A protein has these predicted regions:
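Bacterial N-terminal signal peptides that target proteins for export
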Residues: 1-3
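Bacterial signal peptide processing site
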Residues: 17-20
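Conserved C-terminal helix/tail region of periplasmic/extracytoplasmic solute-binding proteins
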Residues: 292-316
Length: 316
């Protein structure tokens, strides 16, 4: 079964072969209750997913009656495998991946996410603007948020785009001058800045098309209740993060889980989050246009813009 899931994703993202090695979970902290089944969230160590890590640290999931284990992955493709293989009830991805996966396996968007991206350039290069990137190597993950954002920047048509899905590897390649530049989310972009590399383009808290997905086979009342509870905990974490109440200790623990113990908490850019919300029709249209111009097979049905989880999390 697992082999079948992996092969399915390999076909869907046939042009997206990962340069990363097989992902190892980064020692997720488990919250276990003797009377509850533990559900897994497949997340990435980025600001988009921060409210879920924060909710775990603060015990918000248990407050809403769900026991959660967080599995941390280094790439969206690894999260996708966990989602469609049902080893995770909910997982992080983006709208580009969701629409391509829906061509072969149905998935539903639970809610969109928020975070920042930057185009980081190696400090040894005399590059100050994006027009100077022609025939330079910029590491990205193809058919994804970062590819879309890069395509929206003027005069980047001739940039060379090696695919590096693993964010730790992508950051390391900038550090070691193995690529000229990379599109990086927070906090990896800030980590690069701290090492002297330059940001020549930044989108802070922009619509980055990140999202939480669940396999569309999740239709049972119990599983839906768990997803709603997870979304309620997300909203509570958002309120706490936005209020900036006693964040420091919790964020230190989260950064340690992300393998960024040396990262100063005060340097972490925490955006002003919104409560869980679905994508808008114009988001679907923008992603559809991007995928269509690249001859990608995808599905853009209403399942991707439904807001049943978000609405129920606010009203129940």
């Amino acid at each position: 079964h697992v082999f079948g899931v992996v092969m399915c994703l390999a076909v869907i993202f046939s042009s997206c072969g990962s340069n990363s090695s097989k992902s190892d979970d980064i020692k997720p902290k488990e919250v276990v209750s003797a009377n509850k089944e533990v559900v897994t969230l497949a997340l990435m160590p980025i600001v988009d997913c921060l409210p879920y890590y924060y909710a775990e640290e603060r015990g918000y999931f248990e407050r809403f009656g769900v026991s959660v284990k967080i599995a941390t992955y280094k790439s969206k493709l690894d999260c996708d495998t966990a989602i469609v293989g049902r080893s995770a009830l909910v997982g992080y991805s983006d709208l580009f991946h969701a629409m391509m996966m829906s061509e072969g396996r149905k998935v539903s968007v639970v809610n969109s996410t928020q975070g920042g991206w930057s185009l980081m350039v190696n400090k040894s290069l005399r590059i100050k603007k994006t027009s100077q990137l022609s025939y330079k190597t910029t590491a990205i993950s193809r058919f994804s948020t970062e590819a879309y954002l890069l395509s929206s920047i003027p005069k980047t048509d001739e940039v060379l785009l090696p695919q590096v899905n693993d964010l730790y590897l992508r950051t390391s390649m900038v550090d070691n001058n193995q690529v000229d530049a990379a599109m990086l989310p927070e906090p990896f972009a800030t980590q690069c800045r701290m090492r002297g590399h330059k940001a020549i383009w930044t989108a802070v808290s922009a619509n980055n098309f990140g999202c939480m997905l669940t396999a569309d086979k999740v239709k049972g009342a119990e599983e839906e209740k768990k997803i709603i509870a997870i979304t309620k905990a997300y909203n509570m974490a958002v309120d706490s993060l936005n209020a900036r109440n006693n964040m420091r200790e919790n964020l230190s623990g989260i950064l340690a889980k992300w393998g960024m113990q040396e990262f100063p908490v005060d340097s972490l850019h925490v955006p002003t989050y919104s409560h869980a919300a679905s994508f808008k029709k114009e988001d679907i249209a923008a992603v559809s246009q991007f995928l269509r111009t690249r001859n990608c097979r995808f599905r853009s049905s209403g399942v991707l813009v439904n807001d049943r989880f978000c609405k129920k999390a606010e009203t129940h």
